[in-house]
Swiss-Prot record:
InterPro entries: RNA_pol_sigma-70-like, RNA_pol_sigma-70_dom, RNA_pol_sigma70_r2, RNA_pol_sigma70_r4, RNA_pol_sigma_r2, RNA_pol_sigma_r3/r4-like, WH-like_DNA-bd_sf. Belongs to the sigma-70 factor family. ECF subfamily. Pfam families: Sigma70_r2 (PF04542), Sigma70_r4 (PF04545). This is ECF RNA polymerase sigma factor RpoE. The gene is rpoE. Residues 129-178 are annotated as: Sigma-70 factor domain-4. Disruption phenotype: For single rpoE mutant increased sensitivity to singlet oxygen when carotenoid levels are low. For double rpoE-chrR deletion mutant no effect on anaerobic photosynthetic growth. In illuminated aerobically growing cells single and double deletion is bacteriostatic. Transmembrane segments: none annotated. Residues 151-170 bind DNA. It comes from Cereibacter sphaeroides (strain ATCC 17023 / DSM 158 / JCM 6121 / CCUG 31486 / LMG 2827 / NBRC 12203 / NCIMB 8253 / ATH 2.4.1.). Induction: Induced under conditions that produce singlet oxygen (shift from anaerobic photosynthetic to aerobic growth in light). Not induced by H(2)O(2), paraquat (stimulates superoxide formation) or diamide (alters the thiol redox state). Autoregulated. Part of the rpoE-chrR operon. Keywords: DNA-binding, Sigma factor, Transcription, Transcription regulation. One of its GO terms (biological process) is DNA-templated transcription initiation.
Length: 181
């Protein structure tokens, strides 16, 4: 005695779904494969509710992507179970992703007055150190960091070679580091 699934032409059903959006063919395919996909997912570690949801998602994908099924490359069962396996892997990857930390949304708290004072003192020291740089270095530092110009833009603006711009900025940063320490 043969089972009905042995006599069913799954490829013909897939063609009917693909070519005619045949809902009856899809219902027959769904009745046969959805429980098997759910069982496959449960055997691979999913809880029943997740397996049910994933099986529904897999069968919806079968309906939506029926045009991608190629009987010369795989059987209907292989194609459907490959979709199920890939969804299972996607679910595992999603579960492994760390949750972002709870972010506080709202106005920032007021900075500590000691921190504000310290930052003001540091800014004043930096201003004095920049003022002590040679004019050529100071001008480049100000335009690069406060004027938001790239080294290439500075070279084009001043007519100096790019290497000279980089050297002067590096030397200026070295001097600032010495003055600030």
């Amino acid at each position: 005695m043969t089972d009905k699934s042995d006599r069913t032409d799954w490829v013909a059903l897939m063609r009917a779904i693909r070519d005619h959006r045949d809902e009856a063919a899809f219902a027959e395919l769904f009745q046969h494969f959805a429980p098997k996909v759910k069982g496959f997912l449960m055997k691979s570690g999913s809880v029943a509710s997740q397996a049910e949801e994933c099986a529904q998602d897999v069968m919806a994908t079968v309906w939506q992507k029926a045009h991608l099924f190629d009987p010369s490359r795989a059987s209907v069962a292989t194609w459907i179970f490959t979709i199920a396996r890939n969804r299972r892997i996607d679910g595992l990857r999603k579960d492994r992703q760390p949750e972002p930390e709870d972010l506080f949304w709202g106005p920032d708290s007021e900075p500590d007055q000691a921190d504000v004072y310290e930052m003001q003192q540091e800014n004043a020291r930096l201003g004095r150190a920049i003022a002590r740089l040679p004019e050529a270095q100071r001008a480049l530092i100000e335009r690069a960091f406060f004027g938001d110009l790239t080294h290439r833009e500075l070279a084009a603006e001043t007519g100096l070679p790019l290497g000279t711009i980089k050297s002067r900025i590096r030397l200026a940063l070295d001097r600032l580091r010495q003055h600030m320490s």
